[in-house]
């Protein structure tokens, strides 16, 4: 769902830090 996309983006950002 939409939340899954948000989590995926959030995970990518966290991985970038």
Swiss-Prot record:
It is found in: Secreted. GO terms for cellular component: extracellular region. Transmembrane segments: none annotated. Keywords: Amidation, Amphibian defense peptide, Antibiotic, Antimicrobial, Secreted. The modification Isoleucine amide is found at residue 17. The keyword Manganese does not apply. GO terms for biological process: defense response to bacterium. Its main location: secreted. Expressed by the skin dorsal glands. It comes from the Eukaryota. Coiled coil: none annotated. The keyword Secreted applies. Belongs to the frog skin active peptide (FSAP) family. Aurein subfamily. Has antimicrobial activity against L.lactis, L.innocua, M.luteus, S.aureus, S.epidermidis and S.uberis. Probably acts by disturbing membrane functions with its amphipathic structure. Shows anticancer activity. This is Aurein-3.2. It comes from Ranoidea raniformis.
């Amino acid at each position: 769902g939409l939340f899954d996309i948000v989590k995926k983006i959030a995970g990518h950002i966290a991985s970038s830090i």
